[in-house]
């Protein structure tokens, strides 16, 4: 499809940790270039999609289930469609960000990107960024295996809610990580 591989970043994190807030900041910074965003929602209402402020970037919302499990077959097709539209100059972007639901494990998404022949030829996994809530992070790690997986596979962990967390909460959570 393309001579230049398109970087893909997986943005994951705990439920309510602030993934969409971070994504909005990235999209509003013009230094980041044009970004195609794939927003995945678990359930029928795309709440995060409504929270994403309007931007000039293309947002693809897939609502048929958890990105990492039930719609893995749709992810390659969605990315391929984006790449084709980019090649045809129907849309213009330099990178793709996949924002997962807080229930997603990034491993299967990463595996899809690396093992699908078309995706492996046209994209490169740029990294996995996990947003972790400094206030509730330890409890979330205790309660949800998906959160442990999100932290374990992260290239970068961003602590959110540090402005409302107690210094001891932040220190304890950082030590645990």
Which ranges hold each PLM region?
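G-domain G4 guanine-recognition motif of GTPases
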Residues: 99-100, 131-135, 154-175
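A short alpha->loop->secondary-structure connector
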Residues: 116-123, 148-149, 174-177
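Charged helix-capping and loop-helix junction motifs
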Residues: 143-145
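Nucleotide-state-sensitive switch-loop elements of NTP-binding domains
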Residues: 2-10, 17, 21-140
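Structured helix-beta-strand junction loops
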Residues: 33, 153-154
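A short, aliphatic-rich alpha-helical micro-motif
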Residues: 90, 148-151
């Amino acid at each position: 499809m393309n001579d230049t591989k398109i970087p893909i970043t997986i943005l994951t994190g705990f439920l309510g940790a602030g993934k969409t807030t971070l994504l909005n900041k990235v999209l509003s910074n013009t230094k980041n270039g044009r970004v195609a965003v794939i927003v995945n929602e678990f359930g029928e209402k795309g709440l995060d999609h409504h929270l994403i402020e309007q931007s000039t970037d293309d947002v693809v919302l897939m609502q048929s289930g958890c990105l990492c499990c039930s719609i893995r077959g749709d992810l390659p097709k969605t990315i391929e469609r984006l790449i084709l539209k980019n090649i045809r100059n129907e849309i213009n972007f330099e990178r793709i960000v996949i924002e997962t639901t807080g229930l997603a494990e990034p491993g299967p998404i990463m595996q899809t990107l690396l093992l699908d022949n078309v995706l492996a030829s046209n994209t490169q996994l740029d990294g996995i960024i996990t947003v972790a809530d400094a206030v509730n992070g330890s409890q979330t790690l205790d309660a949800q295996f998906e959160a442990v997986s999100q932290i374990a596979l992260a290239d970068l962990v961003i602590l959110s809610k540090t402005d409302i967390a107690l210094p001891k909460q932040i220190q304890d959570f950082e030590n645990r990580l």
